[in-house]
């Protein structure tokens, strides 16, 4: 057994020398070999120790050797790594420090969460983004994380991400308002400031979808206005009421839901405005169902056509897709597949020079289970190739989109 460990130690030493090579190809070969090794505890601790060293600069930030050494070890972690990364943290470069924080925020261990908060305290003012691992998907240890992490909202760059974490912990009923402690008044002030920013903002172009600064503001504001529902304060309630006049239906929806949590009913016309908006219709309905308040949802939008349209639009607004709500969208056909339904739409976007040239384009939403109709739940085939509508017959558009997706999912299942 000792001989095996000795060989692995020698191999790590040899690879370490290659990691210091001026040749990127040699370095990449060495890091790949390390990635493929089955590191034991001692070998992992040794690799973590090596991460303290300086290596030749990488072409791209993601190629940083020190950070990748941390990632290699923490991909298959041992509890012993927690105290080790704590001890070497101050000697690491900024990229490697981020990798350490990501590890501690991902490892489902109480000691790791304590170390995460401790190390975050050292560098939070220097962060541009908050490394929070899988805490959104798997929120845990609220008694460790809060209220301590709220101090770090002093760094405006990461404040909205910390509030997003807090929002998730509220949503999972892991915290209540008492956990805010001395930070409650600051959170209230931050919400009020965000309301002022939104209400006073002047969009710099014909459509806010072309205003990157506003899109960043709207993304952050959604977190604040959603969080506001858990902060019972008259000043917050008044600020939420102000937002009922905002033109952005996404922000208006968050404000309306939060007002309901405060015990105030939004006006009927405001509810109709929100439900009439394709981007947020399904979010709004699902939120009301979760709250047990679906009775206020307008019947005119409680049907499968409207839910399918919203599902299509929600897919289209992704930055990697259309990146905006289409100016027009029309249902062209419904295709049945046993108990499932697919909705074929055409849409166009005249407010964008790039998309205007494409004219009407085809997209499919669904499939939706007819047995649960009307439902907002699509089964994963919502998609568009952004092909011109006139380039194919409706049936051909449907087969082109759904056929390709079915092949993709089948190949994925076979791998």
Predicted regions and their residues:
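Long, helix-rich interaction regions
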Residues: 1-17, 22-29, 47-99, 103, ...
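Amphipathic, non-membrane alpha-helical rod segments
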Residues: 33-37
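N-terminal, post-signal-peptide region of Sec/Tat-exported proteins
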Residues: 39-49
